[in-house]
Amino acid sequence: VRGLAFVGALLAAAAAAAAEDSACPPPPAAIRPAAETVGTTPDRTQIEARHFTSDRRTGVSEFTGEVRLQREGQQVFSEYLRYDQPQDRIEARDRVRLEDAQGDVFATDRLELVLEDRTGETGPGTYTLAGTRRGARGDAERIEFAGHNRTILHRARYTTCPAGQDDWFLEVERLELDQAADIGTARHARVRYFGVPVFYFPYLNFPLSDERKSGFLMPRVGHTDKSGAELAVPYYFNLAPNYDDTLTPRFLAKRGLQLQNEFRYLGRSLDGRVDLEYLPSDDLYGDNRAAFHLRHRQTFGPHWTAVVDLRGVSDKQYLEDFGDRLEIAAQTHLPQNVEVRYGGPLLAFGARASGYQTVDPAIAPLDRPYARLPELRLTTSRPLAANRLNPTFEGEWVNFKRDVGVTGSRLNLAPGLSLPLARPWGFLTSRVAVRHLAYDLNEAGAGADETPSVTAGVFSLDGGLFLERLTQIGGRALTQTLEPRLFYLYVPYRDQDGLPRFDTGVPDLSFESLFRENRLVGGDRIADANQLTAALTTRFLDEADGAERLRLAIGRIYYFADRRVNVPAGTDTATASDYVAEAAAWLPANVAARAFLQWDPRRGEAARASFYLQYMPARDRIANLGYQFIRDTIEQLDASAEWPLGPRLALRARTMYSLRDDRNLESYAGLSYHSCCWAVRLFASRRLSGGTTQVNGIHFELELTGLGKLGEAPASPLKQGLFSFPAETPSRGGGG
């Protein structure tokens, strides 16, 4: 018969597990007086008690008065204990407390147990499981011990809240705790939250620790105007340490049953995710609905990278019906991209196949973007060395595909030489290049040249000074810089009216675009230029740490000749561009601000403007205010905040409001409250749909420590782009 040694430190382990969350008090440790009488059985099971009797003939001993039994990490405390040595069986009564080798504690008034096998049962009692997440505890009408690391609770309650705080508990007919497999399995389980039943599960399993396990996750609940009440019950498949899958049946009251699936994988040099959604016979739409999104990224050695991003939907209304943000619902073209990139010390190479799914079939075929099947790029990647001649090269070959209109391939070459001269007080960079465009076209039209080409030289001269002085603002020592900059660009005119337009457009004017060698974006035009950019920047740098506290910049382009290459075709006769100014400030008290202005002096008004203000005194305290204006198009406010309202209560909110149209574009608001063993979140949303209709949604999320989440508010509205603002006013870009 095996002996056993007393392990008194296991109670402390249970207390430490429950105290992992600082908001949860640790359970009180047991304190027992020293025993006066000690009995040691021949099998080295140690028993202490005030009194005991023993029958050598039957091998049965009885102990009374503060009894303590120890054996192989197990301890039993009681006022009465009967030990049958031949059967290795004990019967204990009156204030019985069993502590096993894992630190789990069971308290009852009756215990029958075979010590070697750990099989037996108790009467009504309570339990604390130190080896589980947060130190789970509860009570049961009967506790059955079915071997080491396996316990079955009958008509039981289970919670991870501290003693005396039954905020939530799982009420079950049968709960099996398999600590070797790290799984809790419940039959006929009800989740009660402050005594109110909120969910019923005929079957439920959950991990006892923080390790990933297969099984049902807690349901997600919500309601939207588009789909009505929502209930989703995810099932998680822990397939391997490096990949998993979640299958989610999602019931939508107005639409039917939708299936969602998320597959994730991770390797040493790769990672990816596949999302699938399928809704057979949408009750509102009257047809099958589906969506997919595949993302994959992989590296091959130190220089090669592959990226795959493919997505698609079944119909034009899918994003409108199921997208949870305005920017998603408003998409008209879904990008599809497969790319391989090489980045070496001298050259960078890229090969890409890309296309789009046009979500709205009403968009005319001639207004849809071209697919690039394929696109090849080659550029020099070495940084320019100062005070020496540097060869540069940019090359691109693209095959443009579309069902209608002109298609074909385009070759774009731009070899060049750069001579950067640099000194601490200034710089001067001269550059010459030759740009060559050549096409091989299909469906060019009767009499049109199917292999047009054009070549033009490019010359630029970019120079600036760095002037500085010491100054003080508000008693703070600062270095102020003054950085005048001139950029001259000359590109001769070449007739390009016969060239196709696959991807070229006019970008929004920005401070950086004042110094571009091509005022157009895309590769179909070599824009003629004879112009000079004059710009001035001043910075205020903190003498203490060198940090930039304030930056102001203004610039303008002066034209010495009319621009004859334009999109759309025509001649631009203006003698100067709009003024472009920007400012950025990092102020005391954790305040940051950024502003942009494009001023049209001919009309005496702003063409574009934006302003963003951010206050962030702590990581969990942030408030943003933004304003954006585009003449005749957009004037809107954007405000967001994440702020604690108390030690456990926090607010998250965002709203975008159109001043031009006097209406809300999109709003989110969420309140969250967390205690040591549960958290609750209420999330409400409202966004514009179809240009005129407001769509409302509400989601409820209850997170129970040790079980999971009951409901789940969509993460994207509150986590993606909500609490930060762009550095510059977004560009609308150019279209093809």
Regions found by a protein language model. Give the residues of each.
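Hydrophobic alpha-helical elements and their junctions with loops/disorder across both membrane
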Residues: 12-19, 437, 491
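Bacterial N-terminal signal peptides
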Residues: 2-15
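N-terminal targeting/secretion presequences
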Residues: 3, 18-35, 157, 309, ...
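Outer-membrane beta-barrel proteins and related beta-barrel translocases across Gram-negative bacteria
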Residues: 104-121, 125-159, 163-174, 178-736
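Post-signal-peptide, soluble extracytosolic/periplasmic N-terminal scaffold domains
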Residues: 19-147, 233, 237-239, 265, ...
